[in-house]
Amino acid sequence: MKIRASARKICEKCRLIRRRGRILIICSNPRHKQRQG
């Protein structure tokens, strides 16, 4: 899980999800998991 100032999609399979006011990126590739903090 990377925590970044700007979370963005890295590949086609990345999905952008808003959960409790946070932006999460969920992907089939575990390296692409991000959270905007």
UniProtKB/Swiss-Prot annotation:
The lineage of its organism: Eukaryota, Viridiplantae, Streptophyta, Embryophyta, Tracheophyta. Keywords: Chloroplast, Plastid, Ribonucleoprotein, Ribosomal protein. Pfam families: Ribosomal_L36 (PF00444). Belongs to the bacterial ribosomal protein bL36 family. This is Large ribosomal subunit protein bL36c. It comes from the Eukaryota. One of its GO terms (molecular function) is structural constituent of ribosome. GO terms for biological process: translation. PROSITE patterns: RIBOSOMAL_L36 (PS00828). It is found in: Plastid, Chloroplast. The gene is rpl36.
